[in-house]
C-alpha cells in the first residue's frame, strides 16, 4: 500500500515538472520562482508601511490596476500555451467569465490592512465593463471584495486609463456622483497604470514578464 501511494505521488510530481518545464520562461518564472513571490510580497509590504504614515481622510483614495497587480492570471497563460495559442480577446473574455484568477502574492494581507484603515480603493482596469459582474464574483471568491470599492472598467476602445484617472481627479464622468479624490498611491504592472501629471501619490509597480507594451 505504501509503495502504491509513493508511486502515485511520484507520477503526479513528474507530470507537474514535465508540464512546468514546457512553459515559456516568463510564465514559468511567475508560476514557480521564489523571486516573483518575494518581489510581490515586498512591494505590498512596503506599501503598507508607507500608507501607515499617510494622513487619510474622506477625499483620499488609492488607484489599483487588477490583472497581475491584484489578480494572478498565470493559469490563463498556462492554458493558452498548452493549446499552442496566443492571447486573444475571445479566450481572455472566457477566462474572465470563469472568475478563477488567484491572488498576486501579498495581496490578501494588504487588502486586510486597507479595510482596517477604511481607505477608498478605485480599480482602473482594462477589463471590459460588460464583465464587471464576473470580476466582482472573482473578488468575492478571493475574500477581498468590499461594496465600497469603485470599479472603473473599460467601456470601449476609446476609454483609456488616463481618461478614467482624470475623472477621478476632477469628479467628472462616472465619478460625478462621488466627487473628486486625492490619490495617495498607485498600484500597477505597466507604465500606463501611473499618472504623468498627478504624481503626488506613491507608485508601486509589480513584475509582469508575461505580457506588456515593451
What are the functions of these language-model segments?
Residues 52, 56, 76, 112-120, ...:
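Sec-exported extracytoplasmic/periplasmic mature domains
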Residues 67-75, 193-195:
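Short acidic, Gly/Ser-rich segments with clustered Asp/Glu that frequently serve as metal-coordination loops
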Residues 55-62, 121-126, 151, 176-179:
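Surface-exposed patches in mature extracellular/periplasmic domains of secreted proteins
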Residues 62-70, 129-131:
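Acidic helix-start/capping segments at beta-turn-to-alpha-helix junctions
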Residues 2-5, 16-64:
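Non-catalytic pre-domain segments flanking phosphatase-related domains
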Residues 25, 31-34, 38, 128-214:
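C-terminal cap/substrate-recognition subdomain and adjoining C-terminal extension
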Residues 71-72, 77-105:
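Metal-dependent phosphoesterase signature
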Residues 94-122, 129-130:
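Short, acidic loop-to-helix structural element flanking the phosphoryl-transfer center
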Amino acid at each position: 500500500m505504501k509503495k502504491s501511494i509513493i508511486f502515485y505521488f511520484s507520477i503526479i510530481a513528474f507530470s507537474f515538472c514535465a508540464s512546468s518545464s514546457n512553459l515559456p520562461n516568463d510564465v514559468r518564472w511567475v508560476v514557480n520562482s521564489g523571486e516573483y513571490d518575494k518581489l510581490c510580497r515586498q512591494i505590498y509590504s512596503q506599501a503598507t508601511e508607507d500608507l501607515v504614515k499617510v494622513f487619510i481622510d474622506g477625499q483620499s483614495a488609492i488607484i489599483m490596476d487588477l490583472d497581475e497587480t491584484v489578480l494572478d492570471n498565470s493559469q490563463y497563460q498556462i492554458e493558452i500555451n498548452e493549446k499552442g495559442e496566443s492571447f486573444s480577446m475571445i479566450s481572455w473574455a472566457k477566462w474572465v467569465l470563469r472568475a478563477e484568477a488567484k491572488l498576486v502574492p501579498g495581496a490578501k494581507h494588504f487588502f486586510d490592512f486597507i479595510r482596517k484603515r477604511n481607505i477608498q480603493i478605485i480599480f482602473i482596469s482594462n477589463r471590459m465593463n460588460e464583465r464587471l459582474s464576473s470580476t466582482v464574483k472573482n473578488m468575492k471568491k478571493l475574500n477581498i471584495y468590499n461594496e465600497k470599492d469603485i470599479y472603473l472598467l473599460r467601456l470601449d476602445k476609446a476609454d483609456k486609463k488616463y481618461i478614467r484617472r482624470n475623472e477621478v481627479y476632477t469628479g467628472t464622468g462616472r465619478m460625478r456622483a462621488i466627487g473628486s479624490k486625492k490619490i495617495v498611491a498607485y498600484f500597477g504592472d505597466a507604465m500606463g497604470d501611473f499618472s504623468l501629471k498627478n504624481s503626488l501619490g506613491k507608485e508601486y509597480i509589480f513584475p509582469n514578464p508575461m505580457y506588456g507594451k515593451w
